[in-house]
Amino acid sequence: MREIVHLQTGQCGNQIGAKFWEVVSDEHGIERDGLYKGNNDLQLERISVYYNEIGASKYVPRAVLVDLEPGTMDSVRSGPLGSLFRPDNFVFGQSGAGNNWAKGHYTEGAELVDSVLDVVRKEAEGCDCLQGFQITHSLGGGTGAGMGTLLISKIREEYPDRMMCTYSVVPSPKVSDTVVEPYNATLSVHQLVENSDETFCIDNEALYDICFRTLKLSTPTYGDLNHLVSIVMSGITTCLRFPGQLNSDLRKLAVNMVPFPRLHFFMTGFAPLTARGSAQYRAVTVPELTQQMFDAKNMMAASDPRHGRYLTVAAVFRGKVSMKEVEEQMQNVQNKNSAYFVEWIPNNVLTAQCDIPPRGLKMAVTFLGNSTAIQELFKRVSDQFTAMFKRKAFLHWYTQEGMDEMEFTEAESNMQDLVAEYQQYQDATVEEEGEYEDEVLEDEQ
């Protein structure tokens, strides 16, 4: 089967990753000790996508857990899923990266990277037909951002034809953990533009908003935020793990979603999002799902899709839904909001379907949008970067790890190019293409 090897790096990556394995194990009926206790053959049919079977109905996640300090790993190990993972797959250093991208990418992380790659190789060799890798990390810190991107480029070298898919937590405008986030994030995006096939952008602030507004939580914890992320991760891969009428895998997703290789940063969303207690009081319909999923308040990245246009969209419906109704509703959204979809990619909405809904819901949908509005997010980080960089603030932390200012300048201009590319395609219309063709014809005559 088409296996995916999962990596989680840094504190953020490990916390999201742990939550993801909770959700997936629950969906597949895997207990905390790795034993299968489910009640449905469909749970086992494609379980090998994420799990290795090592004995009579005992399953171990194809997961590699990486960090430069032991703290987060210890809490995963002593947490509810501690005994699920292979003990050899915990790879950690002792020194930490101290929120310094250069430490993660060039010094501390580079020392640990070979032992991580050994584990990755081992996992990849245990696969029948490896489809690709997914990595959870944040872009604002040292380990997830610096070492995460180092791992991505190393894996890219070794497995150039496999999909590389990242779930990246981008620094949010108001909630900041460290002052050097803009540096770390810009250096990371510089890497992701070149080395990732699909990057799902997630942002803590947008997640907080969803918790306050929609889920009515007065004091959301990181656990609540990570739960939202894990639902989306589970939704994106649901087609690989369960049967459905319209299945999609990482590569099909990329082919449909990425019109230009550099523009592979997606917004994600999920519907129905209802407050924990009120879910059982109402039935959800396909029109409601469709409407909620395109709602700006549902986006898990802090950029407003109404400020840009969608290049492409993918929707993964789960549960017993009528595909005819889904197609009608999706068409309906496009017709009513045609200004928000670029007209030079006809049929730019992909729909996939899977029969098994998430726990506790009759039907649900996961949304992926490649919208030019994501440039707002990059622009914001880029402006903060420039403000600090022109004063060379905090630079010594990076240069003393052996980095060159040149690399900062390159990362800065790459980020600005990315913003400009999104803007260019946001403004592009079919007419421009037409005018150009007329000129060519005149020249030929």
Swiss-Prot record:
Keyword Cytoplasm part of the UniProt annotation: yes
Main location: cytoplasm
UniProt xrefs under SUPFAM superfamilies: Tubulin C-terminal domain-like, Tubulin nucleotide-binding domain-like
Keyword S-adenosyl-L-methionine: no
SMART domains with a match to the protein in the record: Tubulin (SM00864), Tubulin_C (SM00865)
One Gene Ontology MF term: GTPase activity
Database matches in Pfam families: Tubulin, Tubulin_C
Locations listed in the record: Cytoplasm, Cytoskeleton
Residues the entry annotates as binding Mg(2+): 69
GO CC field: cytoplasm; microtubule
One GO-annotated biological process of the protein: microtubule-based process
InterPro entries (UniProt xref): Beta-tubulin_BS, Beta_tubulin, Tub_FtsZ_C, Tubulin, Tubulin/FtsZ-like_C, Tubulin/FtsZ_2-layer-sand-dom, Tubulin/FtsZ_GTPase_sf, Tubulin_C
Transmembrane segments: none
Top-level taxon of the source organism: Eukaryota
Keyword terms: Cytoplasm, Cytoskeleton, GTP-binding, Magnesium, Metal-binding, Microtubule, Nucleotide-binding
Residues at which GTP binds: 11, 69, 138, 142-144, 204, 226
Disulfide bond sites: none
Cofactor(s) for this UniProt protein: Mg(2+)
Record text on subunit structure and interactions: Dimer of alpha and beta chains. A typical microtubule is a hollow water-filled tube with an outer diameter of 25 nm and an inner diameter of 15 nM. Alpha-beta heterodimers associate head-to-tail to form protofilaments running lengthwise along the microtubule wall with the beta-tubulin subunit facing the microtubule plus end conferring a structural polarity. Microtubules usually have 13 protofilaments but different protofilament numbers can be found in some organisms and specialized cells.
Family statement: Belongs to the tubulin family.
Protein task: Tubulin is the major constituent of microtubules, a cylinder consisting of laterally associated linear protofilaments composed of alpha- and beta-tubulin heterodimers. Microtubules grow by the addition of GTP-tubulin dimers to the microtubule end, where a stabilizing cap forms. Below the cap, tubulin dimers are in GDP-bound state, owing to GTPase activity of alpha-tubulin.
Name of the protein described by the UniProt record: Tubulin beta chain
The species this protein was found in: Coprinopsis cinerea (strain Okayama-7 / 130 / ATCC MYA-4618 / FGSC 9003)
